[in-house]
Design a protein with these regions (language model features):
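Pepsin/retropepsin-fold aspartyl endopeptidases
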Residues: 2-282
Length: 282
């Protein structure tokens, strides 16, 4: 009898653990996410940060909120890596409701907390952004959050980037004559490009100056990095001027490059990013 009671207790505990794992999995994958569309006025930052310091960050596969008071209790611990070799185990939570600029409401998504960053109060990462489409208007500095099925009229001359991983939007770029794979499109990075020293030295284009800058792109801390300004650089066989390249281990295509265009359409449904100017031919 005691054995049967113990066995039943263990079965019950294992059932609870299984249910909890399934719930955490579904929450983490974003199956419950619901988004009310709207327009958001971005701030003065060079990246995709709103006026109330919320970053729409395609370079992050997770979301972050500085306070865990808005969510349900702790779901599980997760290992977070900032891409520069820094790791932290942080708590993951689930929230039913988060509002950005009193315009866009995001419901039922997971986020991490447990550390402070004075640069922003929240990150909306690809666990959420992969469920919606975005249209950026550079002249008005407005980010238009659209439904998953929305698609604007796009000119035939638009610059097109396609990626394969819904959560990690990496592309291949030709910089002058160098083909570089696995460059992450990162709207949380405020430069044009980030590549390592090996590729910087191989580029043939002239660069005008080197300087050292501080960057917050390590997520947990700041670091000093080298910034090189290329007076001219071919990117996918198009010539661009005054390209700001930061020397990092991470390969990034940043928001400064995206904002060189009048409009940017992020098509999450078809894993494609379109960039064009108002005078481009339709």
């Amino acid at each position: 009898m005691k054995y049967m009671n113990f066995k039943n207790v263990m079965i019950f505990i294992l059932s609870l653990i299984t249910v909890w794992i399934v719930v955490v999995f579904f929450c983490y994958k974003g199956y419950f996410i619901n988004i009310e569309v709207g327009q958001i006025q971005l701030g003065d930052c060079r990246d995709f940060t709103t006026q109330d310091s919320v970053v729409f960050d395609t370079g992050a596969d997770f979301s972050y909120i500085s306070s865990n008071k808005i969510g349900f209790p702790f779901l599980s611990p997760v290992l977070v890596n900032d891409g520069e070799g820094n790791n932290k185990i942080l708590p993951m939570y689930f929230t039913q409701y988060f509002e950005v600029n009193d315009k866009v409401k995001i419901k039922n998504f997971t986020y991490i907390s447990g550390f402070k960053n004075n640069k922003f109060k929240a990150i909306i990462g690809m666990n959420v952004l992969s469920k919606l489409n975005m249209l950026f208007h550079s002249t008005q500095n407005i980010l238009d959050i659209k439904s998953f099925d929305f698609k604007p009229q796009i000119p035939s001359s638009a610059t097109i980037l396609q990626y394969k991983d819904r959560i990690s939007p990496k592309v291949t770029l030709r910089l002058d004559n160098e083909v570089i794979d696995d460059i992450l499109i990162d709207t949380g990075f405020d430069g044009d490009l980030s590549i390592d020293e090996h590729y910087i030295e191989k580029l043939k284009s002239n660069h005008s100056c080197d300087s050292m800058i501080s960057t917050n792109n390590t997520l947990f801390d700041t670091q000093k990095v080298k910034k090189i300004i290329f007076s001219e650089l071919y990117i996918n066989e198009r010539l661009y001027k005054n390209i700001h390249v930061v020397q990092l281990k991470k390969r990034l295509l940043g928001s400064k490059f995206l904002k060189r265009f009048d409009k940017v359409f992020w098509d999450s449904k078809n894993l494609t990013v379109y960039m064009w100017n108002e005078n481009d031919e339709y």
